[in-house]
Every structure is written in structure tokens, then in C-alpha cells.
Amino acid sequence: MPLLDSFKVDHTRMNAPAVRVAKTMTTPKGDTITVFDLRFCRPNIDILPVRGIHTMEHLFAGFMRDHLNSESVEIIDISPMGCRTGFYMSLIGAPSEADVVSAWTKSMEDALNKVPDVSKIPELNEYQCGSYKEHSLEEAHQIARDVLAKGIGVNRNEDLALDEKLLNP
């Protein structure tokens, strides 16, 4: 099985919250697709709570589109990482890291200011959510407060390159 790009970076050296360009590729038609690692907390040190990350998924997906989509950028998907330390965002285009940081910051502010109670969580029903009872707005708000309090930095692949001696044989 091939070694995926996400496992070629040293997770012990990642800062969080931080943006990282995980991958850039060009489609056969010439479109740029960029995948961002949006790391909310430090791997193996902190972890996002299940209900909180689920609620944040519902909020983050819409708010990031509000603040980042443009004539040259269109978000395809924002999905939580299985390790529950952040989200992957795939998009058409190549926004700057600064633009992503700005959109993420505004999205966290929106999560706190535009969603005052559970009734305002988008798609929170059995028809649109596969686990609609597994949410916590309180935890999502705490995630947003933590991100805003710490500030969002940038992780660079060259700074996180994993020493090949550490790879599993």
C-alpha cells in the first residue's frame, strides 16, 4: 500500500491551530485542486470531543464557504480527520494561507455569534444528518473560543518532513 502524503509529516512537530497545504494537484483540464490540513489541536496531545467536532463540522462547512469561496476558489468538501485533531478542506483553486487563516478566524467568530442555540445548527435533523443526536453546541463553541484565543498559524511541509528512519517498515 502506498504511503499517503498525510503520513509523511512529523505529527510531533505540528503546531495548532494552524493551516497547512497538504497537497496541490492539477486536473487533466488544468484546474488546481488544493487540500488544506486545518489543524485545530496538537496531535497526540489534545483531541476534539466527538459531539463538538460533529457540531463544528455542520457550522464550519457553511461559514468557510461564506468567507473563502470566490470567483477563483470553490470549496469542494470540509471533513473532520479521523484522529479528531482537525479538518481536511479540499477546494478548487489556490488561496493563500493568509486567506484561509482569515476565513477560518471569521468562521470561528460566526460559530460563536451566529449560532446562539441548538435550533440554529444547520441540518440538525434525522433527514440531513446521519447522527443527528450526537451534537454539542457548547463543545463547538469551546472549540471556536480555543482557536480564537490561541490564534491560527501556518505549518509548512518542509518543516514537518518525517525522517525516513521513523517510518514503519
From Swiss-Prot:
InterPro entries: LuxS_sf, Metalloenz_LuxS/M16, S-ribosylhomocysteinase. GO terms for molecular function: iron ion binding; S-ribosylhomocysteine lyase activity. It catalyses: S-(5-deoxy-D-ribos-5-yl)-L-homocysteine = (S)-4,5-dihydroxypentane-2,3-dione + L-homocysteine. Binds 1 Fe cation per subunit. Its EC number is 4.4.1.21. One of its GO terms (biological process) is quorum sensing. It comes from the Bacteria. Keywords: Autoinducer synthesis, Iron, Lyase, Metal-binding, Quorum sensing. PANTHER family: S-RIBOSYLHOMOCYSTEINE LYASE. This is S-ribosylhomocysteine lyase. The gene is luxS.
